[in-house]
Amino acid sequence: GLSGHKSIPLYGKAKAFRFAYDVVYTNVMSAGAYRGYGATQGLFAVESAVNELAEKMNMDPVTLREKNMVRQGQVMPAYYGETANSCALDRCMEKAKEMMKWDEKFPSRDMGNGKVRGVGVAMAMQGSGISAVDTASVGIKVNDDGFYSLLIGASDMGTGCDTILSQMA
């Protein structure tokens, strides 16, 4: 599912990877699919593991990500061997590090009185327009009465695409 498919490709240098999970129903929350279903859960698991690995290696978690993140032009074995033709993870991480003043705030500091100050990091990406995976088409037809018919292969799942696509037409 999306849990592994959208998270493991973040680290394009991985020579071996495996992802397994169990879906568990509880009486706490709804188990239905929502927008982004699966991807965020997988990203939380992978990024938590990367942070744990950085701690065990006594390495800055940003540095660990910078050394292993997928970059533009790199083949992503975990993403059907696709090439990352448009990818700015490296620039995003650099900008985020600068904006949150990472070098000043990492590692965490014990402030006394049971208080600790620190920062955390995680990254995510969303592939769009991936050949043979994310494909779509749109057609527009002028009817005899002068009105248009917009033919799309999408359903509005609360994202507002019905409204937006009709406005674009």
Q: What kind of feature is each model-predicted range?
A:
Residues 1-42, 113-169:
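Gly/Pro-rich active-site capping loops and adjacent beta-alpha segments
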Residues 60-68:
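Short, well-structured alpha-helical segments that form the helix of a local strand-helix-strand
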Residues 41-45, 49-60, 92-103, 164, ...:
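Stable alpha-helical structural segments in soluble proteins, enriched in small hydrophobic residues
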Residues 37-40, 51, 55-56, 79-87, ...:
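Generic amphipathic alpha-helical segments used as scaffolds and interaction surfaces in large
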Residues 10, 40, 61, 76-77:
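Proline-rich low-complexity regions
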Residues 68-147, 167:
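Helix-loop-helix junctions that connect adjacent transmembrane helices in secondary transporters/permeases
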